[in-house]
UniProtKB/Swiss-Prot annotation:
Record's subcellular location: Host cell membrane; Virion; Secreted; Host Golgi apparatus membrane
Site, as annotated: Might play a role in AP-1 recruitment to the Nef-MHC-I complex: 20
HAMAP family: NEF_HIV
Site keyed Cleavage: positions: 57-58
Name listed for the protein in its UniProt record: Protein Nef
Further remarks about this protein from its record: HIV-1 lineages are divided in three main groups, M (for Major), O (for Outlier), and N (for New, or Non-M, Non-O). The vast majority of strains found worldwide belong to the group M. Group O seems to be endemic to and largely confined to Cameroon and neighboring countries in West Central Africa, where these viruses represent a small minority of HIV-1 strains. The group N is represented by a limited number of isolates from Cameroonian persons. The group M is further subdivided in 9 clades or subtypes (A to D, F to H, J and K).
Organism: Human immunodeficiency virus type 1 group M subtype B (isolate HXB2)
Top-level taxon in the UniProt lineage: Viruses
Its membrane topology: Lipid-anchor
Extent of motif PxxP: 72-75
Gene Ontology MF annotations: GTP binding; SH3 domain binding
Region (SH3-binding): 69-78
Lipidation (N-myristoyl glycine): 2
Amino acid sequence: MGGKWSKSSVIGWPTVRERMRRAEPAADRVGAASRDLEKHGAITSSNTAATNAACAWLEAQEEEEVGFPVTPQVPLRPMTYKAAVDLSHFLKEKGGLEGLIHSQRRQDILDLWIYHTQGYFPDWQNYTPGPGVRYPLTFGWCYKLVPVEPDKIEEANKGENTSLLHPVSLHGMDDPEREVLEWRFDSRLAFHHVARELHPEYFKNC
């Protein structure tokens, strides 16, 4: 697996992976802007920064130093099932996401990198609510968010060199359930849409 991901896409991934590590605190269920892209080939006036949270977030990134241009260097498009599966396997092969403590900032960096290098609008990486394991709403994305065992959190916070701003030290402040979560690869998610089974209400209009 991999296709186009295995060649040109490797450029920049080690740098982005390191940034995620250091960061401080039209598949099913993509957002409205991605559905626009799928249907019209462009984001329509019904999805603007004033009416769409993902569009507003992207606009705000232009004000920040994110380390790479916010405007994608490839055509804008919605995330598809095949692209989500390929991306999952690419990241598994290259390493860096498996077992990484999740934070919103790290997810933002990943979303922006994918948006910039592949043109996938960043409204697809959403998960089921907690507590417990959070499953991806986008079918084909093979990373779930798994709560970290309390003893592992305690071990990670020992010693004088612990950064108070590292996501593991924030004790889940990013999370509504106050759980510390990590990305975990699960190849079964390419074939079994767990989120749809657990939360069919999220898929009524898909």
